[in-house]
Amino acid sequence: MSLMILGTSSHVGKSVTVAAICRIMIRQGISVAPFKSQNMSLNSYVTRDGAEIGIAQAMQAFAARVLPSALMNPVLLKPKGDSTSQVVLLGHPYKDVQIRDYYQETDHLLEIAVDAYHQLVEEYGAVIVEGAGGAAEVNLYDRDIANIRLAEHLRLPIVLVADIERGGVFAQVYGTIALLPEQIRPLVKGIIINKFRGDPTLFESGVKTLEDLTGVPVLGVIPYTRLDLPSEDSLSLQDKERQTGLVRIAVIRLPQIANFTDFELLERHAAVDYLLPGESLDGYDCIIIPGTKNTVNDLLALQASGTAAAIRDARGQGVPVIGICGGYQMLGKTVIDDGSEARKGTYEGLGLLDLVTTFEGYDKTTVQVQRTAAPVPPILDAMGTVSGYEIHMGTTVLKSGRTAFAGEGAVSDDGLVFGTYLHGLFMVPAAAEALLSYLYSQRGLTFTGIEEQNEDPYDLLADHFEAHLQMERLLTLCSDHTPETPV
């Protein structure tokens, strides 16, 4: 009882569609798990057993009310720049590869992915498979282990998702189906039109046109909605407009920014802007340097753009500066690379904390943690015990000063500069409230507290899809599926 969700392009809503279907199915008592054979993302999540997967698959697992597992995302590609990506295989670092070399390994990786899928089927019964990017990338058909080659092996019913907000939805859908290989085209059993602005009934003639053109039923027209769910990739950063608010926070949009979902709770209560290196930091109440897949290269980008100097100037004016993971490493005096991170050498950090980070070998830390913040005012002392996860290479040694959390991180004497390896810190309400309360107080204001979500966002998502999706018809597709002989 499984289904494959493909898209006409990236960012059409495949991930949230899978999450919605998973939550709808589990609410109906159907055991289900998500699966994406290959994901390319710098936003990742660490499972309970220390495996690293794409954050979208973790989100989908939560929607399905199951624990995230490396089987749900057996191949994760984390771009490092210069056409190089780190390959995370079944949750653990495999190797760094050039894209051209990666394509030489797709047969091997596909075998691993198919095996992971079958393990999920055995454990959960139903699996909702998500493709990657656009399904009709004809130049990649022979090595596309997330869409076409996977579809050839699994022979699942396919539902195609298109984003009408972008325009050209008829060409998107018709063109994608027409370009699919002959043996895959008959597997397309349904179409979902996503992100419709306005009354979906106004698109009834469009639905008929699409069905006449393709011979495939449209299973739903999903109106555009905003929900508090994690974003998967940096494309979503391009959709974020400059914010206005009582308190302004600058998050440096590093070239290889990773896990920017760390700040989505802050975005609900402050004006959080993601600024490229070189953009002005004037007028911001706090500066956050986020995680990165390449600390050395992004540190050099900060220095070359003048942002490193601007951060030091802001610190001199009393603006809090916070570093998360790679950003924490940059706050130190020195970064030493044996060549495993980027290029061999010793690099000057921002010098705001007395610490040294060394990259040596290919060891990677991936672990869920719980830590107590140091009793250092005016921010950390209000956090208490927090939880999150570490995903990093390199080791950091604090030469002098205090740790920010029990046994980890660093904080300045005045408490206004601190760094930690802890991803997810500001998704903890107490931590976000501690920071926001201080920032509001500096403006002569009182922060009224983190707004509690009374309803589960996954239930809200499922309700939204159920209202506009022919779910019974879609479940029938799943139920009617019997594996065919792979081509």
UniProtKB/Swiss-Prot annotation:
Source organism, top-level taxon: Archaea
GO biological process, one term: cobalamin biosynthetic process
Signal peptide: none
Pfam family, one: GATase_3
CDD domains cross-referenced by the UniProt entry: CobQ_N, GATase1_CobQ
Active site: C325 (nucleophile), H423
Domain GATase cobBQ-type: 246-431
GO molecular function: ABC-type vitamin B12 transporter activity; catalytic activity
Pathway involvement of the protein, from the record: Cofactor biosynthesis; adenosylcobalamin biosynthesis
Keyword Cytoplasm: no
UniProt cross-references to Gene3D superfamilies, sorted A to Z: 3.40.50.880, P-loop containing nucleotide triphosphate hydrolases (3.40.50.300)
Alphabetically ordered keywords of this record: Cobalamin biosynthesis, Glutamine amidotransferase
Family to which this protein belongs: Belongs to the CobB/CobQ family. CobQ subfamily.
HAMAP family with a match to the protein in the record: CobQ
Annotated NCBIfam families: cobQ (TIGR00313), PRK00784.1 (NF001989)
Known function: Catalyzes amidations at positions B, D, E, and G on adenosylcobyrinic A,C-diamide. NH(2) groups are provided by glutamine, and one molecule of ATP is hydrogenolyzed for each amidation.
PANTHER family registered for this protein in UniProt: COBYRIC ACID SYNTHASE, DETHIOBIOTIN SYNTHETASE
Name of the molecule in the record: Probable cobyric acid synthase
